[in-house]
Design a protein with these regions (language model features):
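Active-site bordering "gate/hinge" segments
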Residues: 1-209
């Protein structure tokens, strides 16, 4: 567990080093993961503390205002009904208009301005992904909401404006990230063997390999 944690945090540190960014300026790191890896996350938190970083961990959004289609950003659990997530990915079509987007953008800007000191010392995400899930082929339902042309343009505008706001307060040239992936039991009967092999590859000496 400790070796896996150190591999993760060292990858984060090296990301800053290779891009010539000063990690010592940063105080927080955003850990994102799938539930079930808490033992590893706890070890990662301690390893990040050795780098002078404290974790920021939050649940992936489930409300229509903040979630990103059916993409999970944060910590999340197994999904018992992927079709439902797919069907409801555009539920914001119920209320999205120009006034809403303007207000949402303003609220995001205000939140970052109020917390600009914290944003300035945020280092970026450390992401633990999973693989081996049973393939999902969604069905297109006529009853599901969709964005009309105007709403699609508003959605793109918000994404662009939100990205600019984030980059203003958490400067891209000063932040980095790391990503690692592990299999989950859905991958099949030889899960343990695959998991052990993945750990072996992930923890190889990076100076040698």
């Amino acid at each position: 567990i400790q070796k896996m944690a150190d591999t993760f945090t060292e990858g984060y540190r090296i990301g800053f080093e290779l891009t010539g960014k000063d990690l010592s300026k940063k105080k927080t790191v955003n850990i994102r993961y799938c539930l079930g890896f808490e033992r590893l996350v706890r070890a990662e938190i301690k390893s990040f503390e050795k780098l002078g970083l404290k974790p920021t961990i939050y649940r992936a959004a489930v409300n229509t205002i903040n979630k990103r289609l059916n993409i999970k950003v944060g910590y999340y659990g197994a999904n018992p009904n992927k079709q439902m997530d797919f069907d409801h990915r555009f539920d914001n079509a119920l209320y999205m208009d120009g006034e809403f987007i303007e207000r949402k953008t303003g609220a995001l800007k205000l939140a970052y301005e109020k917390n600009k000191e914290l944003a300035a010392v945020h280092g970026g995400p450390a992401v633990m992904e999973v693989f081996g899930e049973v393939p999902f082929e969604p069905q297109i339902k006529s009853e599901a909401l969709t964005l009309d042309t105007k709403q699609q343009k508003l959605s793109v505008k918000y994404s662009n404006d939100a990205g600019s706001i984030v980059n203003e307060y958490i400067k891209g040239e000063e932040r980095s990230f790391t990503i690692i992936a592990y299999p989950i039991p859905e991958i099949g009967g030889n899960f343990e063997e695959i998991f052990e092999g993945t750990v072996k590859i992930n923890t190889l000496d990076y100076n040698k390999y």
